Amino acid sequence: MRLSRFFLPILKENPKEAEIVSHRLMLRAGMLRQEAAGIYAWLPLGHRVLKKIEQIVREEQNRAGAIELLMPTLQLADLWRESGRYDAYGPEMLRIADRHKRELLYGPTNEEMITEIFRAYIKSYKSLPLNLYHIQWKFRDEQRPRFGVMRGREFLMKDAYSFDVDEAGARKSYNKMFVAYLRTFARMGLKAIPMRAETGPIGGDLSHEFIVLAETGESGVYIDRDVLNLPVPDENVDYDGDLTPIIKQWTSVYAATEDVHEPARYESEVPEANRLNTRGIEVGQIFYFGTKYSDSMKANVTGPDGTDAPIHGGSYGVGVSRLLGAIIEACHDDNGIIWPEAVAPFRVTILNLKQGDAATDAACDQLYRELSAKGVDVLYDDTDQRAGAKFATADLIGIPWQIHVGPRGLAEGKVELKRRSDGARENLALADVVARLT
């Protein structure tokens, strides 16, 4: 993509309404525009990152055996009355009526609807286990939306729902999602720590939040530093095998949110040098809730013994849009964003340091064509901005690799390659650049 043809509305000044780094940088980098309190338009740069995050989430759900579908944003109020949650949710749930006075709501989550879909079609244990997921926009009418995508009212979420004939099967499904989440966040360059958490209005007695450490996080957390060094399973993990050793390894090291923190246990189990009390950002949460919804909504299957019984369920959420904020909070410096390569809007940016110079233009065009032909996402800054402004923009938007092309270097047949993450630079022959980056 040529920057001269791209829509990238960079802001020179820090927006006054932005309280945290991620919100400030997303607005400055032209990723978002606020349309109402807690509601944002996703501009091209932000949308590219959002789609890359979404795809990683999708790939890891599929790898773990979950099946994608798509449910609507609007739900019937009667479904929520059936489960007993309609009145349990407060004013954060947006309730509306259509022209026929039918009561609807803008779904904050989908346990009721997926249970209704399940009970309409699945009657026998032979169809289980089953895990269905979708990636869809949600709405929760936060009283004080703030911090950009970190606490917005409209947000993109992946929610998965597992169905099993008994508790043992449901816990296996829970473990699959636990491991899938470890892999999902690691692929995005994040160290997300699973922590025991309260279940809240979702229900059940088992839940883990996945927390990215950040001083701007909304949750206080207490961890044993050893958890920071635990290995994440690779892509060859056998989801049909026994995942218990992985789960035990990650849950035997102390890590808890402030809601379920046990001070006495923490002090007795964790050496003082290993204790870390900090803050974190929740990027996902998983729940086992047993028969909470199948009991009230009569989602039964015929078991091996021929009798009907309610299914055991779990739900598993990832805040897809929230992840952009979490990644920026964890990956930035004073100059801007530092995107991990897996989620970067572009992998490489070419900076033409003397637009209009024939040799410089030709070298940039050559690199742009050759890298694009290799399938590399390239943003070519072919604008007439001065070199300093181009450097500042490239650092702000955080593209992992910058290629600086100017007459001085080309006089020696060289261009400069800069790695955004640490500022490391190397001079390369023009002919060697494509091989270096592919």
Swiss-Prot record:
Keywords: Aminoacyl-tRNA synthetase, ATP-binding, Cytoplasm, Ligase, Nucleotide-binding, Protein biosynthesis. It catalyses: tRNA(Pro) + L-proline + ATP = L-prolyl-tRNA(Pro) + AMP + diphosphate. The keyword Aminoacyl-tRNA synthetase applies. GO terms for cellular component: cytosol. GO terms for biological process: prolyl-tRNA aminoacylation. CDD domains: ProRS_anticodon_short (cd00861), ProRS_core_prok (cd00779). Signal peptide: none annotated. GO terms for molecular function: ATP binding; proline-tRNA ligase activity. It is an enzyme of class 6 (ligase). Pfam families: HGTP_anticodon, tRNA-synt_2b. Its EC number is 6.1.1.15. Homodimer. NCBIfam families: PRK12325.1, proS_fam_II. Belongs to the class-II aminoacyl-tRNA synthetase family. ProS type 2 subfamily. Catalyzes the attachment of proline to tRNA(Pro) in a two-step reaction: proline is first activated by ATP to form Pro-AMP and then transferred to the acceptor end of tRNA(Pro). Can inadvertently accommodate and process cysteine. The misacylated Cys-tRNA(Pro) is not edited by ProRS. This is Proline--tRNA ligase. It comes from Rhodopseudomonas palustris (strain ATCC BAA-98 / CGA009).
